């Protein structure tokens, strides 16, 4: 199982803090550093010193890291025009030497959209816009150099786009699609994604979502084993109960309920939960790190958890669901 670090900078983070976490994750052997793409703090926090742009951040990290993969979990389709996003991602892919992954979603945080004057249509329309965004981005990247790309949809029209720049990765940077929706999310993942991610679900939720997306792959004639399945879980690991409680308090979480909600407890307890996620079909886990100043937390997981799960394989498609 691959372990990746996932951060929520809208809750309050500077670029330098994100850089420190990304570099610590790289040094610790984690597979990737991902960040959310939000502009407003959640849960009543002040979010000081204020939001940071996801793709500006990743462009900076691309030049200040060397091996770790970088991405968003996830970029909202409502935030950026698809052709502009294709340019941004391709540029950061080049800046990183081919280490970028693009997580895309419909967008869900209504208050964030109203705060920044971003239109927030119905869920159905947001799914329609996400579909067009995926068609446009993959179409631009797949267009041969020297040819132009045109597209006519209900929400977006492109006329003779030069389809440049091209990403470094071939055929393109991996695309991550996530969410717990029962119909359109699995369908889009089966059609476009290299990875399907379920954020913050129970083991039963993970098992059900993976079964759905694998069935959707079969429906479109795709081998389900070609789609990576992953889960995102909050991380709160400590050497003993006191350290777990201290870290839970630092992120405003109840240590009594955290084990049921995420990857919480001693290293052995976190390893056991990761084994359960693998049995549910996940071959990759995103560890949501909420205290960006606690780099000892990452070091503990890198030393005592990562080596125990690196060879852990996900359950095969026919043994899940």
Spell out what each predicted region is.
Residues 1-321:
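Active-site-adjacent structural elements that line small-molecule/cofactor binding pockets in enzymes
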